[in-house]
Amino acid sequence: MARPPVPGSVVVPNWHESAEGKEYLACILRKNRRRVFGLLERPVLLPPVSIDTASYKIFVSGKSGVGKTALVAKLAGLEVPVVHHETTGIQTTVVFWPAKLQASSRVVMFRFEFWDCGESALKKFDHMLLACMENTDAFLFLFSFTDRASFEDLPGQLARIAGEAPGVVRMVIGSKFDQYMHTDVPERDLTAFRQAWELPLLRVKSVPGRRLADGRTLDGRAGLADVAHILNGLAEQLWHQDQVAAGLLPNPPESAPE
């Protein structure tokens, strides 16, 4: 795997907040609510604009209860489950995200297909893990700030994937950051982890999203602002990896964790 790029060096970080960015975001919103896309659907820009689409498959990995389903729900603009229920089988969710490239100032529509599978199903049915890993472009490794064991489990997961799928993007996300005052994972441990693995480590809150004036409907624009750093991070890592694989960028040697 190529060494991760410097954050903000591949895509323009706050472009989604600009006037141009908001025009593109309008195609994934409807009346300030997020649009839900099926596997065969895609957003339509008005007026029609020629835009390339980059599609990626992403497997969300982590212990049961760390918030995998909640994370995907937030990324897709859906309601975050209040009570934990083990995901039965494989659940796929499509999320579109427009981003502007730093080098060319070109806008690309990123299509992320998130695969989420319950831990029990993965252990019981071997073919489910194979299906989730097949042709996967990126792995999102989740831990919970309120579950020390989920953080300590990360090195084993990362080492296993590095051996089985060495060419894929790996990112780490800490969930339930809204409960950071009660964290079981102090900042010094996060710093040591980043230094050892040299991987992107992002944080996300697991609370329900902000609402529109009716008090019931999720605010689509506010929800996008809450997860923009994750979607931009994925776009950046995956686009950079493609450029390296195509020989358009040099691939610096990867440092092994100590």
Curated annotation (Swiss-Prot):
Any Pfam family: Ras
Highest classification ranks of the organism: Eukaryota, Metazoa, Chordata, Craniata, Vertebrata
Record's protein name: Ciliogenesis and planar polarity effector 2
Secretion signal, residue range per the UniProt entry: none
Keywords, alphabetical: Cell projection, Cilium, Cilium biogenesis/degradation, Cytoplasm, Cytoskeleton, Exocytosis, GTP-binding, Nucleotide-binding, Protein transport, Transport
InterPro entries: P-loop_NTPase, RSG1, Small_GTPase
Region of interest called Small GTPase-like, as start-end residue ranges on this chain: 50-258
Function, in words: Required for efficient primary cilia initiation, regulating a late step in cilia initiation. Plays a role in the final maturation of the mother centriole and ciliary vesicle that allows extension of the ciliary axoneme.
GO molecular function: GTP binding; GTPase activity
Keyword flag Cytoplasm: yes
